[in-house]
Amino acid sequence: MNKLTQGKFITFEGMDGIGKSTQSKMLYEYLKSQKIPVILTREVGGTFVAEKMREILVHEELLPMSELLQAMAARYDHMVRKIIPALKDGYIVICDRFIDSTACYQGLELENGIDLVYSLHTTLMPSLMPDITFFIDVEPDTAIKRVNSRNMSNKFDRRRIDFYKKIYSCFQELSHRFPERIKTIKASHLNPLEVHELIQKHL
């Protein structure tokens, strides 16, 4: 925790059903308890406009390129209206999903789509990447069981195991591509508190 200073950008990534949102909230509550200025946000969403875009993105069957551009447009609004101002004011920003989710969920559907996602991001906001990303690594079989046990609220929740395996492989690939930024937390056999304690050790 000694290395954690004001104005840092922390993201959580991984498949659905892995406890990613839980860990985002746990870290947020912990930092608040330490009197560290922090905000918690999410993607797709985080602002009024981006949340409206989220409704279309998660419920409508869009063309692959349309879906990617929708996600990027929502992110641009989120970055400009919320993330960047908070960082400039010295806040730690914790975001439940960010650029790596776009690479895996939208980029995989397009030829050379993963590289396209990072290229678009660099064009829109060249100086903004997370300082640290936590990839919550849970095996696809476990993740889909967790998803199936809850109400399926969007089109991604209704996808099958093959889809989850592709997404999982993508996040693994990104963790190897960006090892300085992405920290992998092996969480398949850990409870939420154990995962949280591992995350704290990286801060």
UniProtKB/Swiss-Prot annotation:
User: Which GO BP terms apply?
Assistant: dTDP biosynthetic process; dTTP biosynthetic process; dUDP biosynthetic process
Has the keyword Kinase been applied to this entry?
yes
Q: Which GO terms describe its cellular component?
A: cytosol
Annotated binding of ATP, by residue: 14-21
Entry EC number(s)? 2.7.4.9
Q: Does the keyword ATP-binding apply?
A: yes
Spell out the family assignment given in the record's similarity comment.
Belongs to the thymidylate kinase family.
Record-linked NCBIfam families: DTMP_kinase
Q: What is the name attached to this protein's record?
A: Thymidylate kinase
